[in-house]
């Protein structure tokens, strides 16, 4: 519980969305924990009205309320560095929720320092990954910070208790029926979890999706788009140079109208359970495939394979909340060094949910047409291949001889 000294309450900074749950948390922190509450609402491109949330926080009792436009910082300093790593969690998930949490938590800590707050708080439940991501970041940046997680601490037994508390404290409770799933959105994706989606056999309803049209309803003609990269990052799409946030938004628009970027998976949470998530990541999907196409021309084979070997670990670190851990930062140094060579253009063909690479070019391409040609010439002498093969097969030939000798000895004993 917050302390009261000489009439002054301790301050706490709350990650506030403006929704019912975080409004209840705001009031609960005031009434049950005796904090002065400062709220922080991040604009990550989710489409919500952040200024409206700021005003609502003040009306609900916050002593101060921050609303910050973090779209460019989010894409430039978090999404794009992660893209350079070709990170996919468990082979599918482009980490749209995971990568947003360290930035939100970082701003919570910065505001706490500015306001002289002793604690930070969030609305993540005690069963999910977000509680870990928020709090790991907070501790990494400010080791002595106090974290308060109401969903782990309060005595409410269910939604009915929460709504009763809200009404008792003048917090409006929506009367319209809530969607039977939860969502989280930012410029990179929208996620859908819980409710009817907890049955892994149940197909998501068509009306659930917001960023993408159904592949069946996508245009009957393919759309082609070119994506340009410089030193590892996308800088232009469709011939238009854009800022990081604007480029990702444009990629979302292009991919979304072609039904690209839907995935449905069961993933392994860091806290130990499996959960089903449905994601829309149209722009991220386009940029992932485009980048891999340019990398295929510009990266040395062993460098590419080494980077790809590190990618699952990098993705795991992001997913589990270790963005500010030294091992993730060390990996980033190598990944950024590799990415310096990734300059070029990829051409994509989008058609009814499919994203296919149909062209790639690069000014410093390692692809040598003369070398791979079936015609004679170039620096490659086909006669050398025989010796190359024999040398690489040497250990297997030795193993085969040893195995054959052992088999003969076993037969002789019989």
Curated annotation (Swiss-Prot):
GO biological process: argininosuccinate metabolic process; L-arginine biosynthetic process; urea cycle
Binding sites annotated in the UniProt record for L-citrulline: 93, 98, 129, 133, 182, 191, 267, 279
Enzyme Commission number(s) from the entry: 6.3.4.5
Keywords linked to the UniProt accession: Amino-acid biosynthesis, Arginine biosynthesis, ATP-binding, Cytoplasm, Ligase, Nucleotide-binding
Protein's cellular compartments: Cytoplasm
Gene that encodes the chain: argG
Complex and partners: Homotetramer.
Pfam families documented for this protein: Arginosuc_syn_C, Arginosuc_synth
Name the UniProt record assigns to this protein: Argininosuccinate synthase
Gene source species: Deinococcus geothermalis (strain DSM 11300 / CIP 105573 / AG-3a)
Any one GO CC term of the record: cytoplasm
Gene3D superfamilies: Argininosuccinate synthetase, chain A, domain 2 (3.90.1260.10), HUPs (3.40.50.620)
């Amino acid at each position: 519980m917050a302390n009261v000294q000489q009439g002054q309450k301790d301050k706490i900074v709350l990650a506030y969305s403006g929704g019912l749950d975080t409004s209840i948390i705001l009031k609960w922190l005031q009434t049950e924990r005796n904090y002065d509450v400062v709220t922080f609402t991040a604009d990550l491109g989710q489409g919500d009205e952040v200024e409206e949330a700021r005003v609502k926080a003040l009306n609900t009792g916050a002593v101060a309320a921050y609303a910050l436009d973090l779209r460019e910082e989010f894409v430039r300093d978090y999404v794009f560095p992660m893209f350079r790593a070709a990170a996919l969690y468990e082979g599918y998930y482009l980490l749209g929720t995971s990568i947003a949490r360290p930035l939100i938590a970082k701003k919570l800590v910065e505001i706490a320092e500015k306001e002289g707050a002793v604690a930070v708080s969030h609305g993540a439940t005690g069963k999910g990954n977000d509680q870990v991501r928020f709090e790991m970041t907070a501790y990494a940046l400010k080791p002595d910070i106090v974290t308060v997680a109401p969903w782990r601490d309060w005595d409410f037994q269910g939604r009915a208790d929460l709504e009763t508390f809200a009404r008792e404290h003048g917090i409006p409770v929506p009367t319209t029926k809530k969607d039977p799933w939860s969502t989280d959105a930012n410029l990179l994706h929208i996620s859908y979890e819980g409710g009817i989606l907890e049955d892994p056999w149940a197909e998501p309803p068509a009306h659930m999706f917001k960023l993408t049209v159904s592949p069946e309803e996508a245009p009957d003609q393919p759309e082609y788009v070119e994506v340009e990269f410089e030193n590892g990052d996308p800088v232009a799409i469709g011939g238009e140079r854009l800022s990081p946030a604007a480029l990702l938004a444009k990629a979302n628009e292009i991919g979304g109208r072609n039904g690209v970027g839907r995935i449905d998976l069961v993933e392994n949470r860091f806290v130990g359970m499996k959960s089903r998530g449905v994601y829309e990541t149209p722009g991220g999907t386009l940029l992932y495939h485009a980048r891999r196409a340019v990398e295929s021309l510009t990266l040395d084979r062993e460098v590419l394979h080494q980077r790809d070997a590190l990618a699952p670990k990098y993705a795991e670190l992001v997913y589990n909340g270790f963005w500010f851990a030294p091992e993730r930062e060390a990996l980033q140094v190598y990944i950024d060094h590799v990415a310096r060579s990734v300059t070029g253009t990829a051409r994509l063909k989008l058609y009814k949910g499919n994203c296919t690479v149909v062209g790639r070019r690069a000014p410093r391409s390692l692809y040598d047409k003369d070398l791979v040609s079936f015609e004679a010439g170039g620096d490659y002498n086909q006669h050398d291949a025989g010796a190359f093969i024999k040398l690489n097969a040497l250990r297997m030939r030795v193993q085969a001889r040893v195995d054959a000798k052992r088999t003969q000895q076993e037969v002789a004993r019989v």
